[in-house]
Amino acid sequence: MDAIQEVKRIIPEVQKYVNQRMEEFERLGREGWTHFDFRPFLDIDYDAGLFSELSFCILTANSSATLGIKIQAHLGEEGFLNKTKEELEEVFRKFGHRYAGQRAERIVEAREKFPKVKSLIEKEKNSKVIRELLADPKSPYKIKGFGYKEASHFLRNIGFKDLAIIDRHISRFLMEKGLLRQVKSITPKVYLEAEKALESLAKELGLSLGELDLYIFYIKTKKVLK
């Protein structure tokens, strides 16, 4: 089955959950907070703010969305903003995160950059410009642990719809469908190639990249998460 047919086949099954998630993302970007409800895929719902979403994207890199969601639900905005590095590390270990110390350190470091990042998001409307600034090591906005994928993930989750999140599920789907050459790792060059392939697919399906990501994630995992 080609990519277009496969996505079209599952749209009726999960469209209401994808639409709900996109609304939750847009509210987070617009109002600075949102209420996420992951049922029926995970029996979890909670309020989230911008910094806790940034922290979620730091946590999920080379980990899983499910684990990130559980930790985010447990800590809330206040926990991510106020707990010490040691306290965060203890929570991450308790939940079984493989990189507990490293992620705690990165989240504490990100607090210093956050006011600057927040003002960048408010004034700059071009998502690709913001992504570059969040991922570029020479940028004053650089978040440690963010490359294109993590920056795109954060921006999609706060309402920017035109960026692709090339994680292992998405890259595998593209390679299986012959839309991306077989690669062992996702370099920035490969990332942009994959994003281009997804842009064409999204256009044919009449979807945004943000929506398409959720549909492909569902094809691969049977869950609509984030």
From Swiss-Prot:
Its EC number is 3.2.2.-, 4.2.99.18. NCBIfam families: PRK01229.1. GO terms for molecular function: class I DNA-(apurinic or apyrimidinic site) endonuclease activity; hydrolase activity, hydrolyzing N-glycosyl compounds. This is 8-oxoguanine DNA glycosylase/AP lyase. The active site is at residues 149, 167. It comes from Aquifex aeolicus (strain VF5). The gene is ogg. HAMAP family: Ogg. Catalyzes the excision of an oxidatively damaged form of guanine (7,8-dihydro-8-oxoguanine = 8-oxoG) from DNA. Also cleaves the DNA backbone at apurinic/apyrimidinic sites (AP sites). It holds the Pfam family Ogg-HhH. GO terms for biological process: base-excision repair. Keywords: DNA damage, DNA repair, Glycosidase, Hydrolase, Lyase, Multifunctional enzyme. The record marks 226 as: Important for guanine/8-oxoguanine distinction. Belongs to the type-2 OGG1 family. It catalyses: 2'-deoxyribonucleotide-(2'-deoxyribose 5'-phosphate)-2'-deoxyribonucleotide-DNA = a 3'-end 2'-deoxyribonucleotide-(2,3-dehydro-2,3-deoxyribose 5'-phosphate)-DNA + a 5'-end 5'-phospho-2'-deoxyribonucleoside-DNA + H(+). Signal peptide: none annotated.
